């Protein structure tokens, strides 16, 4: 019989840099999960994506074992990296902080495609373009 899931934990952690300190320790510790085992597995799976923030969804079972699913990096992180800016604009309608090309937009949309609620790449590009607009990043033709 399948194991019963007792908790779903969502965290966004830097790739390859999970450690038992907060937020990982308290989130997993309260469910009795082996924190070091999670940190080692997560760091091993995300070592090739250094510098990115990778969201993770952890399922904790009643016997205290766990499984986790890695998601794609947030669109805002990918847009900031493509535009070469530290952070988005605090007034996106007035001040623009950078710009990305259509090709970069398509690349980001393809990366995000598994996690987006979109049927084709064009719809995914519109979703990512909306995120860019809200960050004060313009899209060049």
Swiss-Prot record:
Originating species: Rippkaea orientalis (strain PCC 8801 / RF-1)
Subunit annotation: Part of the ribosomal stalk of the 50S ribosomal subunit. Interacts with L10 and the large rRNA to form the base of the stalk. L10 forms an elongated spine to which L12 dimers bind in a sequential fashion forming a multimeric L10(L12)X complex.
Name of the molecule in the record: Large ribosomal subunit protein uL11
UniProt keyword annotations, A-Z: Methylation, Ribonucleoprotein, Ribosomal protein, RNA-binding, rRNA-binding
SMART domains on file: RL11
CDD domains reported for this sequence: Ribosomal_L11
NCBIfam families to which the protein is assigned, alphabetical: L11_bact
Function field: Forms part of the ribosomal stalk which helps the ribosome interact with GTP-bound translation factors.
A GO cellular component annotation in the UniProt record: cytosolic large ribosomal subunit
Gene that this sequence comes from: rplK
Record GO terms (molecular function): large ribosomal subunit rRNA binding; structural constituent of ribosome
One annotated GO biological process: translation
Family as reported in the entry's similarity comment: Belongs to the universal ribosomal protein uL11 family.
PROSITE patterns attached to this UniProt entry: RIBOSOMAL_L11
Pfam families: Ribosomal_L11, Ribosomal_L11_N
Entry PTM: One or more lysine residues are methylated.
Domain of life per record: Bacteria
